[in-house]
Amino acid sequence: MIQKSAQFLKLVILKLRGINQMNTQVQVVSPQNFFDESRSIAEKFIQTVVAVDDNISFIERPNSVNNSDLNVQVPDDESGLGTSSVGTHELSLDAPDLNNDLNYQELSACFADKSILCSALKAYEGEDGEQKTIEATFNISKKADITILDWQMERDQSNYGNIAKGAIKKLLQYDVDGNGRLRLILIYTSESIPTVLRALKDQFTEFQPKIENEKEIQFSFESLSLCKVVVINKQTNIESLVDRSIEEFTHMTCGLLSNATLAAITEIRDKTHHHLYKFNKKLDAAYISHVLGLISSPAMRENAHEVAFDYGIDLLAEEIKSDLQISSQVKKSLSKDVLQNWPNFIIEKNPETIFKFKIGDSFEVPVTLERVKRILSVTDKSEFENILEEEPKFLLDSSSGTIAKTFSDKYIQFMINDDNLQEHLELSAIQCTRRNMKNRGSYVPTLKQGVIVKRREDKKFYVCIQPLCDSVRVKDLTNFTFLRISKVPNAKPMTHVIHGVDVPYLAFDVDPKSKNIYMAQFLPDPSEKMVKAELCNQKYIFKAGDEVFEWCGEFKQPIFQGIVNDVSASLARVGFDSFEWLRQRKS
């Protein structure tokens, strides 16, 4: 039976692949496809570009060149720079190519047309020129969105690539130390692109490099997942170089939530002056009044400055949140039209892609491109039910009665080709996790509401539900209240997920009943009047007498507030005997 089902599913998938390929051929092209929308968002986000070359000129070229006046030939080996691997589609005759000097005036003007600031650095000469150029490139590129490097900046041909490799290595280490960042590095060269790629891969082994698409280096190292090095041919002219840099940057960020993130950051940057105008220095006296009010209260005096800080941050956060919620650019990045275009983009990248739905614990059901698009845009109930009834059908849950009810009652997992449980766990963890060992920075954990700990003795997990006001100004041994939460396998029913330390994710089933409440006594830090964790064998721990609790992270405020509310509701339930006839009349 299972074998027949597998064979049937295989036939359905093969049929769907043919339909998907046909759909990509006959589909009507929308005014702006998903990649174009992503490129527009990326272009608005990019602010800074750095270009480094040994042959930079800072004056405008005297003459322009017309296509009809040019007879372009690919350089041969006699140039001493190797054979060019450029294709005819990469050549543009509107401007001189990069085999000549890099004209900063033209480069900066091309980026300026897109409201992007471009800085240039000319390689140093002299005995220590290489090292000085590496240091200067590193310093100027640390905060740049895009760095453009010439591969051949050295006087000695045998040393070609030393400056580029040295600067890139320092940037990669800087990004790893800072837990990663979005970074694109472009290298233009007259040498064979595969040769340069191999040289780069051999140089950066500690960062787990891999050659992708025969043109770029990506990294398996987790902190460098948003960094790539792209190698292009010097025959590319300046205008094409600018367009290529934005295009490659877009390939790194082209996604639904990543587009929304870029649009949100751009919106915040654009509103910087608006926020400074609103929170201007004239409000300083009013803020000091708030601090004085806290200091005047005996109950708040010891932590007045921390409370005032939280108040200020909440003000700023709410203001930014309000702006993002009404931002047309952010809304557009996740609009209905964008969601409609997204499946087309996935199929265009790989026509062999199969979309699947998994409803609850049932088998995966493959669906066509057009069916996915209709489900994403449907608003009418009967139309929705008709789409669900199409072949291949979703498995009907006997307790639900209809496929539409099954769709409503069970969790829905959308899949591209293979099982993507990890991606769903990641989004769940992002929703739930406020802090963990990876993103805590210099923060030393404090025991308070929302903190998740593991008791070493029995390996059980607990979340602190102590009221926040009872977690500060602690002077002596104090009871802290916890709720025991069950760690469950990632494939089992769960209510909360956080990023783990020894494992990628920790999934929990939180039962707010009173039977799971647990209490332990802790001594506070004498100076801070709070229970602070201490570092032991690379882990933060809290000690309650002989009991040791490992700090695993913290839930975000809405998450732990919801848990506390559920516990309170459970404790507030009232049970009493009543007249059965009257009780049953309630329904």
Residue ranges and their predicted role:
Residues 2-50, 54-146, 151-352, 469-587:
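Extended charged low-complexity segments that act as oligomerization/scaffolding linkers
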Residues 324-446, 451-463, 484:
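Flexible loop/N-cap segments at domain edges
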Residues 466:
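Phosphate-binding/switch region of NTP-binding enzymes
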